[in-house]
């Protein structure tokens, strides 16, 4: 028959074994949780890195400051960065004159242009630098700089890409580029992708990726609501504000 002291020692040993087993089980579960959390963190980091890949795109710029440097635009095609933002006018090659009295149209989103010449002309707004291009067998001019005091303020770097956007943003999925080239906004697209598809819009306040933007879209207006950085609702026919 066991003595009381022996019983006490056995009970204490069993209790200690239970505690050790519980601690070991808890530690194993903790290790698994930490391993899973680390895996999830790595996956999120990959997702964020992919989502933020646009931040690492650095388009080349020409930084023109006079007529001679602006003629670099002739050396390669250009693509319109901000669709439906810049007015172009009819140009008479024989008379080397621009009809500033009538708008000929707006440059479309990612429209590809071949600039044939760059020159200084007089306009109702003072002297301007214009870029000459052809479209539908007609010749047009679009202002790329305005004279301020004795110098010209150039904004052509804000108007044009001088590299193919398809190469600059080649990390975008093929289905995204298919929609962009078709000038369509689809659920899941980012604001920049929508801008490339249908031009610049007017936001209803809010912060990028968490707001509604109204796009004139060259006379085919639509509104797009973004959440979490992606388009979640597209409403055709909504008037741009």
Where are these regions (language model features)?
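SH3-family beta-barrel domains
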Residues: 38-97, 158-160
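Conserved beta-strand/loop element in small beta-rich adapter and peptidoglycan-binding domains
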Residues: 98-121
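N-terminal Lys/Arg-rich, disordered targeting/topogenic segments
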Residues: 1-8
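A cross-family detector of function-defining hotspots
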Residues: 29-32, 120-126, 170, 174-241
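Hydrophobic membrane-insertion alpha-helices, especially the h-region
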Residues: 11-28
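Boundary regions of SH3-family modules and the immediately adjacent low-complexity/disordered segments
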Residues: 133-169
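A short macromolecule-binding patch
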Residues: 71-73, 78-79, 136-148, 223-226
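Hydrophobic single-pass membrane-insertion segments
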Residues: 25-37
């Amino acid at each position: 028959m066991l003595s009381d002291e022996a019983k006490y020692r056995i009970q204490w040993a069993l209790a200690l074994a239970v505690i050790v087993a519980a601690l070991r089980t808890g530690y194993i579960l903790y290790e698994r949780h930490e391993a899973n959390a680390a895996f999830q963190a790595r996956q999120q980091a990959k997702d964020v890195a992919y989502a933020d890949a646009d931040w690492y795109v650095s388009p080349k710029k020409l930084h023109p400051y006079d007529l001679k440097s602006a003629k670099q635009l002739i050396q390669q095609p250009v693509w319109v960065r901000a669709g439906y933002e810049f007015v172009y006018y009819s140009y008479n090659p024989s008379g080397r004159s621009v009809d500033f009295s009538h708008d000929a149209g707006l440059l479309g989103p990612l429209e590809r242009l071949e600039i044939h010449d760059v020159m200084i002309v007089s306009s109702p707004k003072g002297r301007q630098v214009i870029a000459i291009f052809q479209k539908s067998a007609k010749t047009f001019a679009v202002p790329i700089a305005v004279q301020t005091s004795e110098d010209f303020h150039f904004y052509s770097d804000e108007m044009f890409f001088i590299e193919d956007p398809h190469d600059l943003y080649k990390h975008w999925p093929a289905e995204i580029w298919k929609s962009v080239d078709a000038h369509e906004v689809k659920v899941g697209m980012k604001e920049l992708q929508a801008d490339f598809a249908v031009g610049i819009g007017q936001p209803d306040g809010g912060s990028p990726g968490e707001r509604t933007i109204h796009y004139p879209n060259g006379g085919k207006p639509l509104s797009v609501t973004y959440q979490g950085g992606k388009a979640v609702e597209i409403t055709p026919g909504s008037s741009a504000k």
